[in-house]
Amino acid sequence: MQELEERIREQGVVKPGNVLKVDAFLNHQCDVRLFDHMGAAWAEHFNNKHITKILTIEASGIGIACVAATHFDDVPVVFAKKAQSINLDGEQYVTHVYSFTKQKEFPVIVSKKYLNAGDRVLLIDDFLANGKALNGLIELCESAGAIVEGIGIAIEKGFQGGGDALREAGYDLDSLAIVESMDAETGAIEFRH
């Protein structure tokens, strides 16, 4: 998606350790118009999938998923929580994922009330690096008997292999910007097309 690539080039900051900082528009301050355009792009890509639910993971995926849902007949958005809470009652699906950004493992939890057998799920997230978070969401869907119809990612770090592995596993993955390489010293960012 050219618009997203331009924003990454203009406002993204490459940090050491393969970190791409895009908090000016994606995951701290949110550009809702950009999110709307992203949702429209995913709706076009997944238009034949009959999505009944969108699943993301807290926190950065929530805004993107909610705006995207308006392009999918306002289907419900469920976000997996990263910590147990007194607000999470009843039976739950739980798995554990390792966060590249946080450099630690954490639980991922969804109430069984909100993820059901037969749900046709679109997974949405802001970043895809090694695929650990998405594999956790896929595992939650499998536990529920839900069908993963597709995966929508804002920015994929193509050089970290998670996207390639998901494609090889047969998932319909639509990453709107795929970073092929980036250099913390020069700030250079190259995209895959």
Curated annotation (Swiss-Prot):
Enzyme Commission number(s) of this protein: 2.4.2.22
* Protein origin, superkingdom: Bacteria
A GO cellular-component term linked to this record: cytoplasm
Q: Which SUPFAM superfamilies did the record assign?
A: PRTase-like
Q: Which Pfam families match?
A: Pribosyltran
The positions annotated for binding 5-phospho-alpha-D-ribose 1-diphosphate are: 129-133
Q: Tell me one GO molecular function of this protein.
A: xanthine phosphoribosyltransferase activity
Q: Where in the sequence is the signal peptide annotated?
A: none
Q: Name one GO biological process term.
A: XMP salvage
Catalytic activity reads: XMP + diphosphate = xanthine + 5-phospho-alpha-D-ribose 1-diphosphate
Q: Which UniProt keywords apply?
A: Cytoplasm, Glycosyltransferase, Purine salvage, Transferase
Principal EC category: transferase
Q: Does the keyword Transferase apply?
A: yes
User: Subcellular location, in the record's words?
Assistant: Cytoplasm
Q: Where does xanthine bind?
A: 20, 27, 157
List the pathway annotation.
Purine metabolism; XMP biosynthesis via salvage pathway; XMP from xanthine: step 1/1
Its chief place of residence is cytoplasm
Instruction: Respond yes or no to whether keyword Transferase is given for this record.
Output: yes
Q: Which family does it belong to?
A: Belongs to the purine/pyrimidine phosphoribosyltransferase family. Xpt subfamily.
The subunit field of the Swiss-Prot or TrEMBL record says: Homodimer.
* Biological function: Converts the preformed base xanthine, a product of nucleic acid breakdown, to xanthosine 5'-monophosphate (XMP), so it can be reused for RNA or DNA synthesis.
Q: What is the protein name given in its UniProt record?
A: Xanthine phosphoribosyltransferase
- The species this protein belongs to is Bifidobacterium animalis subsp. lactis (strain AD011)
> Taxonomic classification, please?
Bacteria, Bacillati, Actinomycetota, Actinomycetes, Bifidobacteriales
